[in-house]
A protein has these predicted regions:
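Conserved glycine-rich cofactor-binding loop
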Residues: 10-11
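Conserved glycine-rich Rossmann-like NAD(P)H-binding loop of the short-chain dehydrogenase/reductase
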Residues: 26-41
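Conserved mid-core segment of classical short-chain dehydrogenase/reductases
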Residues: 67, 71, 87-103, 121, ...
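Catalytic Tyr-X3-Lys loop
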Residues: 87, 94-113, 130, 147, ...
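Alpha-helical segment proximal to the catalytic Tyr-Lys
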Residues: 121, 163-167, 230
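Catalytic loop of short-chain dehydrogenase/reductase
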Residues: 130-167, 179-180
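C-terminal helical subdomain
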Residues: 174, 196-232, 239-241
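Short C-terminal tail/terminal secondary-structure segment
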Residues: 233-263
């Protein structure tokens, strides 16, 4: 059975990806940082589908911990690698400190390259690497400057790896989601009324009149990991319900309410 490795796999989009790839027949290994309860729930969900599940605890900003987590996989080849994890400080660029920059790039870029360098030599010709980018790479999202730059770098690495690994039959592509209904998005506004109004505003501005769901992102990732996507290479696929076909005015009001919009 193929083995899929997912970073940030204990919640949100990462969890949906792990469960979808398990449904499609993959054994699952996933890296999580600290929520052991959530990780156990993902393991149980994967095993309920008849697939093996291995939760690997590691701080992706610590190379030694990443190496130790990968050691647990032994010599088992990884067929599918989904780089989903990210972390940053959400604040204006002029307020960023060196450690914010270092942490963001260590997790988004450093850990990604470390994992690819470790697993790619044993990846089979049908191997797949999928990176999860974000809408902040092509639209201003208040407080996301450092994360946006790291995700943009991740998209660049996606294209470079597509060229370098392509001759071996390994595909490398990126998914760039829009507004997806996860617990992390819900933290942008502190109170329930504000969150509800924010989501309603986004839904109203989206041609499909709906926020994205983690399972919809997972479905696109599953396609990219399938044989049907064997000729898809070095692409960034946008999955946003069409929300950015509109002028950005609908979101400005709500980003101002977060206190992150420039004054």
């Amino acid at each position: 059975m193929p083995l899929a490795l997912v970073t940030g796999g204990s919640r949100g989009i990462g969890r949906a990806i792990a469960e979808r790839l398990a449904r499609d027949g993959s054994d699952i290994a996933f890296i999580y940082r600290r929520d052991a309860k959530a990780a156990a729930e993902v393991e149980a969900a994967v095993r309920a589908r008849g697939r093996s599940a291995t939760a690997l605890q590691a701080d992706l900003g610590a190379p030694a911990e990443v190496a130790a987590a990968l050691d647990r996989l032994g010599d088992t080849p990884v067929d599918f690698f989904v780089a989903n994890a990210a972390a940053t400080a959400f604040r204006p660029l002029l307020e960023m400190k060196p450690h914010h920059l270092e942490k963001t790039y260590a997790i988004t870029i450093g850990a990604f390259l470390q994992i690819v360098q470790r697993i790619a030599p044993r990846m089979p010709p049908s191997g797949r690497i999928v990176t999860i980018s974000g809408m902040d790479t092509h639209r201003y999202v208040a407080g996301h400057g450092i994360l946006a730059s790291a995700k943009a770098a991740l998209e660049a690495l996606t294209r470079y790896l597509a060229v370098e690994l392509g001759p071996r039959g390994i595909t490398v592509n990126a998914v760039n989601p829009g507004y997806v209904e996860t617990d992390s998005v819900a933290t942008y506004l502190a109170d329930e009324a504000g969150r509800k109004a924010f989501f309603e505003e986004i839904e109203g501005a989206t041609p499909l009149r709906a926020l994205g769901q983690p399972e919809e992102v997972a479905a696109l990732v599953a396609f990219l990991c399938s044989a049907d996507a064997a000729w898809m290479q070095g692409q960034v696929l946008y999955l946003d319900g069409g929300v950015f076909l509109h002028a950005p005015g609908h979101s400005v009001r709500w980003w101002r309410q977060t206190g992150r919009w420039p004054r």
